[in-house]
């Protein structure tokens, strides 16, 4: 394999071709950064968190491919992934994940000690998540914790403590992850059943769409509560209702239980997260 081909394989390993995961990790972090700073955010902190989000998502993808290498070869959608196809060794995947995680940790050195302590917990959860699909009936919950760690870290970096609103935001993000990743798990449900893996789509079975609806409901309720605690103006509702419309559209898609529609609903959650961010920006900036 030439050097160019190897770098291309590394790009696929960390999903440079699929930015949706980075965006789903970034939106909750941006929600928290704007709320914690009351809309007046230091540019250096913003850049640190944006870059850190990219690095940690990339590290998570690498460790995920390492963990799933023996399963991916049995699923048509994942057979071409670099590790399971043999383009990158398992040891290389671990090395890439470790290097990216180290870069992320070095990146946050200008931040306070509390943020650094939280980053260690975030790293542990991110690296544990891929293995939970073997024994935990709801790995999406762990994903929600991993994808939401930017929330307490953002508050810690700006305020040096974590207020009540942050925990409502964090809890809402866990429910959001359950919603969008259950839709994603519905795509591979037949393969996961055959391989003996655990996902929320398998755990809830025929009630999968109901669980997605309830999870979305909890997300939107949490944001309403956060809006009250943060004293956001009613302009927050512009983004909130736009996000709600997205969720209704997603429920229409997943109710078909068609693979393509479920995957479309998963990807479309980027818009939902973006609209909730818009609501926070408007709620803070327009009174």
Swiss-Prot record:
- The answer to whether the entry has keyword Cell inner membrane is yes
Pathway per its UniProt entry is: Cofactor biosynthesis; ubiquinone biosynthesis
Put simply, this protein is called 4-hydroxybenzoate octaprenyltransferase
One Pfam family name from the record? Answer: UbiA
Domain of life of the source? Bacteria
Record-annotated membrane-spanning stretches: 7-27, 30-50, 94-114, 118-138, 142-162, 167-187, 209-229, 235-255, 266-286
Function as written in the Swiss-Prot or TrEMBL entry: Catalyzes the prenylation of para-hydroxybenzoate (PHB) with an all-trans polyprenyl group. Mediates the second step in the final reaction sequence of ubiquinone-8 (UQ-8) biosynthesis, which is the condensation of the polyisoprenoid side chain with PHB, generating the first membrane-bound Q intermediate 3-octaprenyl-4-hydroxybenzoate.
């Amino acid at each position: 394999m030439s050097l160019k081909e190897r770098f291309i394989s590394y790009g696929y390993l960390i999903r440079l071709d699929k930015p949706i995961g980075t965006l789903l990790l970034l939106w909750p972090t941006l929600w928290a950064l704007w709320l914690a700073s009351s809309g007046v955010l230091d540019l250096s902190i913003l850049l640190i968190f944006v870059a850190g989000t990219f690095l940690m998502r990339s590290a998570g993808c690498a460790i995920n491919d390492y963990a799933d290498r023996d399963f991916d070869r049995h699923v048509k959608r994942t057979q071409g992934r670099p590790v399971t196809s043999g383009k990158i060794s398992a040891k290389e995947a671990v090395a890439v994940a470790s290097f990216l995680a180290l870069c992320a940790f070095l990146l946050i050195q200008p931040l306070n000690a509390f943020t650094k302590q939280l980053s260690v917990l975030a790293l542990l959860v991110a690296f544990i998540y891929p293995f939970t699909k073997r024994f935990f009936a709801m790995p999406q919950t762990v994903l929600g914790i991993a994808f939401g760690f930017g929330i307490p870290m953002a508050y810690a970096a700006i305020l040096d403590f974590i207020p009540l609103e942050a925990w409502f935001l964090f809890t809402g993000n866990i429910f959001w992850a359950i919603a969008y990743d259950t839709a994603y798990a519905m795509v591979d449900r037949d393969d996961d059943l055959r391989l003996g893996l655990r996902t929320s789509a398998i755990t809830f079975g025929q009630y999968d769409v109901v669980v997605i609806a309830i999870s979305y409901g909890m997300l939107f309720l949490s944001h309403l509560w956060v809006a009250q605690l943060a004293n956001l103006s009613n302009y927050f509702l512009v983004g909130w209702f736009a996000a709600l419309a997205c969720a209704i559209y997603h429920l229409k898609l997943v109710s078909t239980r068609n693979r393509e529609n479920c995957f479309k609903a998963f990807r479309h959650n980027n818009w939902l997260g973006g609209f909730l961010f818009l609501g926070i920006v408007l709620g803070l900036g327009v009174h």
